Amino acid sequence: MNHEEQKVETMEQVEAQPVEPTDVDSEVTAEQARIAELEAQLEAAQLASNEERERAIRAVAEMENLRRRAAQDVEKAHKFALEKFAAELLPVLDNLERAIELADKESEELKPMIEGVELTLKSMQSGVAKFGLNPLDPLNQPFDPNAHQAMSMIENGELAPNTVIAVMQKGYELNGRVIRPAMVMVSKAPA
């Protein structure tokens, strides 16, 4: 046999021999299993981390909403703390206006008293205005059920229907919130 034939025969013998698993193959398989296990643990840890991150973001957003609501509640409490007190002052303002309206302005003896009542009324009006208590002036304005209380309706062809044509009692608002609606007469279309 020549050298070439010997090589071919040896190679055929090597190829024909069954390859038995060695310790190297079992080590590779064990390492692959360990890698797969670690990858699964990593994926589970990442999912848990994402869930915790989302939970933390929601908690922060909820805290911000709570803080904002608390600030709004405090602001409203400051703004409307005077509401009951202001409502109690309204009859005093009404009485001062009524006293001026009904006073005999021709009487010389009453002129100093009328001036005093007028000054008291102006002083009181400017004082309550500093705290946000302002009268509503609905005359010739469209009727607003949130700010007006209709006491009667009168036919009027000159004004649009549901227009305030007379104010029987002033309404007041405190910082934009109506604390007493104005009592008004409202126009209606002629029949």
UniProtKB/Swiss-Prot annotation:
Top-level taxonomic group: Bacteria
SUPFAM superfamilies: Coiled-coil domain of nucleotide exchange factor GrpE, Head domain of nucleotide exchange factor GrpE
Cellular compartments annotated: Cytoplasm
GO molecular function, one term: unfolded protein binding
Stored PROSITE patterns: GRPE (PS01071)
Predominant place of localization: cytoplasm
Disordered: region residues: 1-28
GO biological process, one term: protein folding
GO-annotated cellular components: cytosol
Residue ranges the record marks as coiled coil: none
Pfam assignment, any one: GrpE
SUBUNIT field: Homodimer.
Known role: Participates actively in the response to hyperosmotic and heat shock by preventing the aggregation of stress-denatured proteins, in association with DnaK and GrpE. It is the nucleotide exchange factor for DnaK and may function as a thermosensor. Unfolded proteins bind initially to DnaJ; upon interaction with the DnaJ-bound protein, DnaK hydrolyzes its bound ATP, resulting in the formation of a stable complex. GrpE releases ADP from DnaK; ATP binding to DnaK triggers the release of the substrate protein, thus completing the reaction cycle.
Name of the protein: Protein GrpE
Gene name tied to this protein: grpE
